[in-house]
Regions:
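Short, flexible, glycine-rich and Lys/Arg-enriched loop motifs at helix boundaries
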Residues: 173-178
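Juxtamembrane cytosolic amphipathic helices that cap and anchor the N-termini
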Residues: 5, 110-115, 124-127
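Membrane helix-loop-helix hairpins that form the core translocation module of multi-pass transporters
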Residues: 38-115, 201
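Kinked, hydrophobic transmembrane alpha-helices enriched for aromatic residues
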Residues: 125-138, 168, 199-202, 206
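Transmembrane helix irregularities
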Residues: 19-20, 124-125, 163
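Hydrophobic residues within alpha-helical transmembrane segments
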Residues: 12, 16, 41, 45-49, ...
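Juxtamembrane transmembrane-helix termini in multi-pass membrane transport proteins
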Residues: 2-74, 135-157, 166, 170, ...
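Selective transmembrane alpha-helices of multi-pass membrane proteins
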Residues: 67-99, 160-168, 179-212
Length: 212
């Protein structure tokens, strides 16, 4: 796998991870419905900023560690694949469960600055997000990535995270898209679970190989 393909794979995997309904998703949805569209967009910016932090840590820390402990590279691929399969099974089981969001009739004016920090702190305090980033970067990034990847990945990660949650904010601040997603949630979640399972199996099956 070339470095360019690895970067693209990381971005796709992070996009799929961002789409998984979790604390970040619910927070953006609640702020968009219960406060305002501006608060939802500010929360999305906070999620993107948190993605930059996770991306930078994954790039620097994992690369340095894998340089000195090569067997850990294989172990992380197996662990990452197992975690992705675990996450996929949870998503599949919870696909039929509705997402609890705030009552849109209880809307009030919020602070965009506060919403931004809520998004940032929620992103950074979620251990599942940290594990997700570590798994994806360790599994897909080459052991000796080119210098340009350190420059382009953080801003691209920001656009992936912020871009997805901006879509969430825009959708949940309007009635029809919100109702459509809530009706289709079961099938959307199961499609995401299938894609994540395929990625997890690939990581485990290719773990004995050196490089990606």
């Amino acid at each position: 796998m070339t470095a360019m393909a690895a970067v693209f794979g990381i971005l796709v995997a992070l996009w799929l991870g961002a789409m998984i309904p979790g604390p970040s998703f619910v927070l953006v949805a609640r702020n968009s419905i219960g406060l305002s569209r501006r608060d939802g967009l500010a929360t999305a910016l906070g999620m993107g900023a948190g993605g930059i932090v996770f991306g930078a840590v994954a790039l620097g820390g994992l690369y340095t560690l894998l340089q000195t402990v090569e067997w850990l590279y294989v172990a992380l691929k197996v662990a990452g694949g197992a975690y992705l399969l675990f996450m996929a099974s949870k998503i599949w089981r919870g696909a039929a469960h509705p997402i609890a969001v705030a009552d849109p009739l209880a809307a009030r004016v919020g602070s965009t600055r506060k919403s931004f920090w809520m998004g940032l702190t929620t992103q950074l305090s979620n251990p599942k997000t940290a594990i997700w980033y570590a798994s994806i970067f360790a599994a897909l990034l080459p052991q000796h990535p080119p210098l340009w990847s350190y420059v382009v990945l953080p801003p691209l990660v920001f656009f992936v995270e912020c871009g997805w949650y901006t879509i969430v904010a825009l959708c949940f601040s309007t009635r029809r898209p919100r109702e459509w997603y809530l009706r289709a949630k079961k099938w959307v979640d199961r499609a995401a679970a299938g894609a994540i399972s395929a990625l997890g199996l690939r990581l485990i099956l290719t773990a004995p190989k050196t490089g990606i």
